[in-house]
C-alpha cells in the first residue's frame, strides 16, 4: 500500500514541529543562563561600586558558585 500525499504532508509538519520544539527548548535554556549570568555580573558590579565609595554592603553576601545572595 502506497502512502498518500496527505500522509506525507502530515509527517513533514509533525517532524518540523518536533525540530522547532527542540530548538526552542535549547534557546530558552541559553537565554535563562545568559540572564542569570548578567544578573550576577550586575549585582557584583554594584557591590564593587558601593565598596569603592566606602559605603557598607552588609545586605549582600557572595554565596556558592560566586552568586550574590542576600544575607539571612
From Swiss-Prot:
What does it do?
A: Peptide with unknown function that does not resemble any other pilosulin-like peptide and appears to have a coiled coil structure.
Tissue-level expression reads:
Expressed by the venom gland.
Instruction: State the organism of origin.
Output: Odontomachus monticola (Trap-jaw ant)
Q: What is this protein called?
A: U-poneritoxin(01)-Om7a
Q: Which GO terms describe its cellular component?
A: extracellular region
Keyword Ubl conjugation in record: no
Query: Where does it localize?
Result: Secreted
Signal sequence span is 1-27
What's the chief localization of this chain? secreted
Keyword check for Secreted, yes or no.
yes
Q: Which residues form the propeptide?
A: 28-45
The entry assigns this protein to a family as follows: Belongs to the formicidae venom precursor-01 superfamily.
Arranged from A to Z, the UniProt key words for this protein are:
Secreted, Signal
Specify the domain of life of the species encoding this protein.
Eukaryota
Amino acid at each position: 500500500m502506497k502512502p498518500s500525499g496527505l500522509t506525507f504532508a502530515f509527517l513533514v509538519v509533525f517532524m518540523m514541529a518536533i525540530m522547532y520544539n527542540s530548538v526552542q527548548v535549547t534557546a530558552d535554556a541559553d537565554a535563562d543562563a545568559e540572564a542569570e549570568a548578567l544578573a550576577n555580573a550586575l549585582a557584583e558590579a554594584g557591590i564593587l561600586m558601593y565598596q569603592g565609595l566606602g559605603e557598607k554592603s552588609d545586605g549582600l553576601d557572595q554565596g556558592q558558585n560566586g552568586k550574590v545572595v542576600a544575607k539571612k
